[in-house]
């Protein structure tokens, strides 16, 4: 998906989304971030991505967080990917809904 990879780079690697899903993973999925600035920025970035690329770029964002090594243990990894899959829903991106990707 070279097009989606390019979009990922154009939108600063969805840095705000990475921050949001990392916090969700580290805090055990607590919902206190639901209205935070990271989420607002993330949703704005996500809305600029072509619809077919929304899930692929979120998957890339999750992988980038894994490679940075701040996510510890299988539970945090699960939470990380769950948070990433849910973002289109949380950001209310029409016609995308929840992403289907798994860890790999």
From Swiss-Prot:
Q: Which SMART domains does the record match to this protein? A: AAI (SM00499)
Q: Which UniProt keywords apply?
A: Disulfide bond, Seed storage protein, Storage protein, Taste-modifying protein
Q: Name one GO molecular function term.
A: nutrient reservoir activity
InterPro entries registered for this protein in UniProt? Bifun_inhib/LTP/seed_sf, Bifunc_inhib/LTP/seed_store, Napin/2SS/CON
Q: List the disulfide bonds.
A: 4-53, 17-42, 43-91, 55-99
Pfam families registered for this protein in UniProt: Tryp_alpha_amyl
Q: Which CDD domains match?
A: AAI_SS (cd00261)
Q: What does the record give as the function of this protein?
A: 2S seed storage protein having sweetness-inducing activity. This form is not heat stable.
Q: Which family does it belong to?
A: Belongs to the 2S seed storage albumins family.
- PANTHER family per UniProt: 2S SEED STORAGE PROTEIN 1-RELATED
Complexes and interactors = Heterodimer of a small A and a large B chain linked by disulfide bonds.
Name of the protein in its database record: Sweet protein mabinlin-1
Q: Which organism is it from?
A: Capparis masaikai (Mabinlang)
């Amino acid at each position: 998906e070279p097009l989606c990879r390019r979009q990922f780079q154009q939108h600063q690697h969805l840095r705000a989304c990475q921050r949001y899903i990392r916090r969700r993973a580290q805090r055990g999925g607590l919902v206190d971030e639901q209205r935070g600035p990271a989420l607002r920025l993330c949703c704005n970035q996500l809305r600029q991505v072509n619809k077919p690329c929304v899930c692929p770029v979120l998957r890339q964002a999750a992988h980038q967080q894994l490679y940075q090594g701040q996510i510890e243990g299988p539970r945090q990894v699960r939470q990380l990917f769950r948070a990433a899959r849910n973002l289109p829903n949380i950001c209310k991106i029409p016609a995308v809904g929840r992403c289907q990707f798994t860890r790999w």
